[in-house]
Structure formats: structure tokens, C-alpha cells
From Swiss-Prot:
This protein's name: Small ribosomal subunit protein mS23
Keyword Mitochondrion carried by entry: yes
Family: Belongs to the mitochondrion-specific ribosomal protein mS23 family.
Positions of transmembrane segments: none
Keywords: Mitochondrion, Ribonucleoprotein, Ribosomal protein
Amino acid sequence: MGKYNLTALQVRKTAIDSIAAGKKGDLPRWVNVVGDIPPAQILVRERPQQHPLVRQRMKTIPGNPTPQPVFQVQTKRVKPKKASRMFLPVEIKYEEDQLRKEFFRDHPWELARPRILVESSGKDSERYNWSRMQQPGKKLDGESVVQRQLWLLNNVPDMTKSRAYDIARREFYRLRLQEDIERRVAVEEAEATGAVFGPSRLEIGMELENQQFEAWKSWAKTEAQIVDQASTSEDGSENQSLP
């Protein structure tokens, strides 16, 4: 059939004919499965489905005192692709992806904080109510800011992206400051009752850095002496060679 090779579509018929012709062995177990679920006969591949970005906003419509939800569909311009990449799956994007990118760009050290990635049932997010920043059973982190900002954009009338970001950050800073104060008070109370704490992670890191610096300084001093001795010996040999 021209350039199309349809041998794979006839694999079941080939196996049955081989057994019928007296070939030794049993009929493969997959023969009945392939008979129930035959291979596709369509030779034309369809391009992958496009995934538009849908945004929900609350808008105040003139003449209507109640704000109405408005869904904005942002269609992505389809760029011409190479033939080898034409049928690759299309990337799925969500609105919070951009919000998350902006927050961690402004707060890169939030990525250094330890995070819990294990979920008990996989539906933990369904129990959260992002009308407020702090959620029971969830540690305060950058994702809290992202979800809080998204809730403000979806539920507060005429809310802009920058204003929602400022509100979410202000609440986040206030709660983070409260956590720091509680941590300091707990340490002071423990030390007042006789507790002794070891070096912090920052102090341990500085000590390791100092050790590496001292080792490098010793190595650099030795290398400098070797270079000086080599240059001195070369100067001496040149002076001896002169008449």
C-alpha cells in the first residue's frame, strides 16, 4: 500500500494462521485481546488539542448592583513548528503559574525553606478556604500567597493583579513576622529554664566555609612559594649563563 507498512495491523491474523498451519506452540495470550481491541485503522494523525488559559474575574456591570463573574479566555497564538515537533503534546498552563513565578522571583529565599510534599488523601486543597491567608493544617509558605492572590482575583470585584499581590504579600509578611516573634520568645523562655541550644544552621555553615577557606589559603601559600622558587631558579640559571 505505497509507503505505508500495515504488517503490524495483521499480527493477530498472522499468529492464527501460523498455528493453523501446524506451527508448534500455543496460541499467544494476546490474540483474544487484540481481537477485542484492534489497532487503530486511521492513518491521519490529528494535531494535539490546544489548551486556552481561562481567567475568572468579578466585574461590576453598569446597571446591575451585583458583581457578575466574567470568564476571560486567553488564546495562545499558534506558532509554526518543525515537522518533528508538530504532534508533541501542548503545554498546559494555569493562571497561578505566572503568579507563582513572580512571587518566587521576588522572594528567592522562600525556595530554601523546607516544604512538605506528601499529601494524606490527595484532596487536601479542597479543605482550604483562601478567603484568609492562614489555613489549618498547612504551613505558611509561598504557595499560600499564590492561592490567596488567586482567590482575591476571582472573588473580589474589580480587583487588579498588582493590588491582589500587595494585599497577599502584606498578610504574608505580617504572619511571617508573627512566627519569628513566637520563635524568639520560645527560645528565650527555654534558655531561661536552663535549655542549651547548639549552633544554628547558619553558624555551622559559616564554620564549614571558614575551614574550606583556611585549607585554600594554605594551598595557595604553598603554590605561591613553588612559583617563587621556580622563578628564582630561572633567574639564577640565566645569570650563570651570562659571560
